[in-house]
Amino acid sequence: MSDSKMSSQDESKLEKAISQDSSSENHSINEYHGFDAHTSENIQNLARTFTHDSFKDDSSAGLLKYLTHMSEVPGVNPYEHEEINNDQLNPDSENFNAKFWVKNLRKLFESDPEYYKPSKLGIGYRNLRAYGVANDSDYQPTVTNALWKLATEGFRHFQKDDDSRYFDILKSMDAIMRPGELTVVLGRPGAGCSTLLKTIAVNTYGFHIGKESQITYDGLSPHDIERHYRGDVIYSAETDVHFPHLSVGDTLEFAARLRTPQNRGEGIDRETYAKHMASVYMATYGLSHTRNTNVGNDFVRGVSGGERKRVSIAEASLSGANIQCWDNATRGLDSATALEFIRALKTSAVILDTTPLIAIYQCSQDAYDLFDKVVVLYEGYQIFFGKATKAKEYFEKMGWKCPQRQTTADFLTSLTNPAEREPLPGYEDKVPRTAQEFETYWKNSPEYAELTKEIDEYFVECERSNTRETYRESHVAKQSNNTRPASPYTVSFFMQVRYGVARNFLRMKGDPSIPIFSVFGQLVMGLILSSVFYNLSQTTGSFYYRGAAMFFAVLFNAFSSLLEIMSLFEARPIVEKHKKYALYRPSADALASIISELPVKLAMSMSFNFVFYFMVNFRRNPGRFFFYWLMCIWCTFVMSHLFRSIGAVSTSISGAMTPATVLLLAMVIYTGFVIPTPSMLGWSRWINYINPVGYVFESLMVNEFHGREFQCAQYVPSGPGYENISRSNQVCTAVGSVPGNEMVSGTNYLAGAYQYYNSHKWRNLGITIGFAVFFLAIYIALTEFNKGAMQKGEIVLFLKGSLKKHKRKTAASNKGDIEAGPVAGKLDYQDEAEAVNNEKFTEKGSTGSVDFPENREIFFWRDLTYQVKIKKEDRVILDHVDGWVKPGQITALMGASGAGKTTLLNCLSERVTTGIITDGERLVNGHALDSSFQRSIGYVQQQDVHLETTTVREALQFSAYLRQSNKISKKEKDDYVDYVIDLLEMTDYADALVGVAGEGLNVEQRKRLTIGVELVAKPKLLLFLDEPTSGLDSQTAWSICKLMRKLADHGQAILCTIHQPSALIMAEFDRLLFLQKGGRTAYFGELGENCQTMINYFEKYGADPCPKEANPAEWMLQVVGAAPGSHAKQDYFEVWRNSSEYQAVREEINRMEAELSKLPRDNDPEALLKYAAPLWKQYLLVSWRTIVQDWRSPGYIYSKIFLVVSAALFNGFSFFKAKNNMQGLQNQMFSVFMFFIPFNTLVQQMLPYFVKQRDVYEVREAPSRTFSWFAFIAGQITSEIPYQVAVGTIAFFCWYYPLGLYNNATPTDSVNPRGVLMWMLVTAFYVYTATMGQLCMSFSELADNAANLATLLFTMCLNFCGVLAGPDVLPGFWIFMYRCNPFTYLVQAMLSTGLANTFVKCAEREYVSVKPPNGESCSTYLDPYIKFAGGYFETRNDGSCAFCQMSSTNTFLKSVNSLYSERWRNFGIFIAFIAINIILTVIFYWLARVPKGNREKKNKK
């Protein structure tokens, strides 16, 4: 925390100065005029004398009041609160007082300013202008146009800078914010509020600041701030990004530790300080009860959305920044909490001299009254800056009218909306209209002249002062030992690493599934793989299998870290945020993540290698074993650091996985086993030299074979008729054998087969360690200097054809969202208060198809009770809630964050998936809910969950086609969609894509689309809305509420949760259901005019009277103790249960049940159907939507294409035109084997897109009964097949022809039929890849776990397919795995199709030289052997026989159980495996993901 210093001596001087100033004024004028502006200026000038800055109080009374207040606090060190007998300083006490605590801290700092060195910082700027690159390529790239778009953008990037490429986001503006002043930034979304805050916080990566701009932070430049004081000027973004599996307490304590100052007080250790500070902010923002609850996110259960927002606020507050820029920080907070947050900022500003700025979209009058300064922005122009109390008066003098009951903030913002502002009578032609006219008026005003004068004085003052040195001293005093004074960080690099390691262990503790799964998976794979090579013999027959086992061991250790790339992308946005807060260096986090992974890596290595080494029967020697394990560990480290480096330099997971896989393929092929070193092609030999895995493999082979003698397992010739032949006339077939010798030296074998030597063993360990250190340095450097994602102005994306139409349509207008750039700037829709007028409901009513459905049914509930099990404890979330929603009424559902509002909506709409409804009834017209209930309602969720690749119109049509009655024609549904687009004023962006944040719809547009998706379904019963105004500006929130009012007026029943209703918005609701903590009802009844009925109820039962100027919503939250820091006088749940109003509610529910149940029910069979559309229609629409999603995701498709092309070409050219000798046949077999390597990456690329579809379906579409689970899963499976066939075809051509397999079909003139079959096999493999990925994801929650499972299954398939070990080698209990392995049949089919029916010609070094007995020719000696063993011989000049073990490729195929006659059978079996995958995907998805039955269990009374 920061502060300014003022000694008691200075305080007395100020008091004396004030009294002197007053007396001199009276003396000279002889008349008392009160405390006027002149006096105020004198006081401020005096204050500057003492503090080198302007004092925050504008009056002597305020200053004296401040001095009095400071005398009330003890000024003690509060961090060891257990030893202080003052509950107001103890954050764990119910009597904790945040304001008292802050005052005490200020007094503590002032008690020893030389030690604490409190600091403060203001900002002033002149001619501030921000501009960005205009992006004309605002169409969504697809597979067909993505490359062209990339090329054109690249060309434009290298063009010389010219003004046409840029547009101004912020026009020239001036302002000054002094320490102690709280400033609010007002403007509609897109006005430039976020850009202004980012500019002040020096967070400008992605846009530029004009050269003419002058910015100073009390004498410090923006460069100084960015380089040395980054954590003292922060920008808190609107989004909440946290590690979901960390608890709230751990999240905040981590931030507190990293900003713990060195000068925190004598005897206070860091941990005590950090825990105390975290507790203080948890208590301040009402988070103490969530200390041990996970933060969570949209998909991981945790605290509520409002509480998560408060966690973000608390985390930013703990940074202790002097200048804090808050961007829409109150989004998702209830009105009382939002007010409390602004009060906390005010307290910090007034007492600790901080300089907070906050852009706020919904600001109550109570909140506005707390602000000192206000900035009003209009399309990038500053149209006012000054005292908040003067702004309203300034614009009223200009000629604008402020309506009654409209808050000042709403009035100021409404001036930037032409449809909402209203000039005073007689000023219609005098007031400015455009943003430029407003700015011109402002810059010609006396207020602006006064401002420029003050700014000029401030700049002169900054030049004269020694702030730079004073501020540096204060900064250095806070820094821990071993921290560079110029560093922006508070703690040293090694402390950052230490805290990062501790946090990562807490993350693992919060979600141990991935490390446990990884270790368990390694153990299982160790057992499986080692059992394949179980107990290898000590003969030459084990040479190949010993090498294969070592090869697999190296690969498994090397690539066990591949999935670490995925976790990097999860953490990246959080690390970038913390870097901007100056909590830690990204490099410190990178090192911490590596250190914290060490125990997991060691556990994984032990679980695999200990089992594998001894079961395979590698060399039983302690020294040899520990060398093996040492090399394996370093191999894991090298590859982990390499994969992390790839992830650090990539911008997306698919972009990282593709090069990682190609690299993996290169390393596998050039390890030295697949292609032995002597057989590598000359052009590619260098790859082996830079391959760290190759060095590991060589050392491990040397470690295993050097100095050992192996018994020969096979002689040539041998068998019947050769029993009595002398060893001198036989030779061992193993490489390195010596004629006549029964033993083969392992050293000679390595030298002959691989050119491996013992002298390289320890050298290679050093090289491997060098690689590990090198890649670690690369990784740390990349994370440190990577600037992260560039900020982009919001642009709206259209399809290319739609964009041209849109540009033609809006060419005449170029107004609107200035932050959005040229394209979005053309979206000029109006959010006027009367946005939805009656004409829109009636203008098309005559057609019949677009009439809004009338509703005559009443939904009500009684004694609804819901509980969940949290850590073996049953916790009641809703406690006997009663209520109803009648047609034509809007019922507001309110309560503090976490009170159970969303849970109640989920229970009422039958959307709960966890927990149990233990009691209560939900009835429609007195009848229990039937199967069509969910289809009869609309549910507008708080999260705007949409597919980013669909357009607005497509999303609405998809909902209409599947949710409206199947009897309604397509044209009528399309007409209704157009009607809703017009109704919600989405015409300008109806053909825009949803997109992602920054490139797509903005928050307001997404909310309108969410509402629209439900409206086009024509919900006949009622409409639920969960926080529909969250994140919207006041005008848009108002227009949404007016829209709800119009819907209700046309018979719709609406139940709506709302957080921050102004008095105006509250007036739009008819009834209120208010929940207090624990899901208990505090009130259900009419609101009355100006909420008077509700106010009367609470005042009747003992509440303090509601002030006339108070917002009833905020007052009510205070009364029931739902606002942070407030305490209820009584339990209002008990008050409600004992009230006459409660009895009236119960009687009304009983009356409705009795009366309504007598009404006739709708007996239309179609009305009772679970889904409106038939299954075939659901399937077709879902499949097409998924195909379109992939087509509009060119990054995914091109990553897939790049992967298969690069992998296939690399594979094909590594084995280019493989010869038909013995090594060549083995190379061709391994080429087929390597062809499967991209499997893992293809699955990992696909999973995120499957998850996106599944999230949209399970979160929104399944509960709404849009379409069935079977249509969803069938559509996902079907839509992937065309793309897999396409990439399979590309892979076939890139691999089949370079490898030269077609040459093997030439002798039998079967090139075409064998080529066609090979194409079918290759494409079938790619289809199998997709179905296997979907199978693994069908029942998995996390994509990481599905990817791990797919890797496990893939490894098993590779291991048991017969390439590395055939059925004659496998232990008996694994034969079943060979038989039921799809890759067995695929490999057999591909090998037989590619290699069959041609001749073998041995290379010179492959011949075995045999000397026949004296007097015998080679023919007579070897012909009997060749007849049963195969092969051929050549007679050499010296009479010896050069024997080749094979003469036909069919002999080789037979040795690997691949028969040409079975090729079509094997293809058919592989297709059957694809079908099995599809069937299992459907079954497992139904078992694991489809809700069955209901969550209702009634207690028997």
Swiss-Prot record:
Summarizing activity control, the record says: Disulfiram reverses CDR1-mediated drug resistance by interaction with both ATP and substrate-binding sites of the transporter and may be useful for antifungal therapy.
Query: Knockout consequence?
Result: Leads to hypersusceptibility to the antifungal agents terbinafine and amorolfine, and to the metabolic inhibitors cycloheximide, brefeldin A, and fluphenazine. Shows a decreased number of germ tube-forming cells in the presence of estradiol when CDR2 is also deleted.
Q: What is the effect of changing residue 678 to A?
A: Leads to selective drug-sensitivity
Q: Which residues bind ATP?
A: 895-902
Mutation: residue 664 to A; reported impact is: Leads to selective drug-sensitivity
Query: What happens after mutating residue 995 to S?
Result: Leads to selective drug-sensitivity
Which keywords, in A-to-Z order, does the entry hold? Antibiotic resistance, ATP-binding, Cell membrane, Coiled coil, Cycloheximide resistance, Membrane, Nucleotide-binding, Repeat, Transmembrane, Transmembrane helix, Transport
Q: What is the effect of changing residue 1056 to A?
A: Leads to general drug-sensitivity
Provide the effect of residue 671 to A.
Leads to selective drug-sensitivity
Regions of this protein lying in the Extracellular compartment: 535-548, 619-622, 676-764, 1217-1229, 1302-1314, 1377-1466
User: What result follows from mutating residue 667 to A?
Assistant: Leads to selective drug-sensitivity
Membrane topology type, per the record?
A: Multi-pass membrane protein
Q: Bias regions of kind Basic and acidic residues — which residues? A: 8-18
Q: Which residues form the ABC transporter domain?
A: 150-404, 859-1103
What does altering residue 774 to A do? Answer: Leads to selective drug-sensitivity
Q: What is the effect of changing residue 561 to A?
A: Leads to selective drug-sensitivity
Result of mutating residue 677 to A? Leads to selective drug-sensitivity
Impact of changing residue 1346 to G on the protein?
Leads to selective drug-sensitivity
Gene Ontology cellular-component annotations: cell surface; extracellular vesicle; membrane; plasma membrane
Kindly list any coiled-coil regions of this protein: 1137-1164
Q: What does this protein do?
A: Pleiotropic ABC efflux transporter that confers resistance to numerous chemicals including anisomycin, cycloheximide, fluconazole, miconazole, ketoconazole, itriconazole, nystatin, terbinafine, amorolfine, brefeldin A, amphotericin B, fluphenazine, as well as estrogen. Plays a role in farnesol-induced apoptotic process through glutathione efflux activity. Mediates in-to-out translocation of membrane phospholipids including aminophospholipids and thus regulates asymmetric distribution of phosphatidylethanolamine. Exhibits nucleoside triphosphatase activity.
* Name of the protein in its database record: Pleiotropic ABC efflux transporter of multiple drugs CDR1
Organism, as annotated: Candida albicans (strain SC5314 / ATCC MYA-2876) (Yeast)
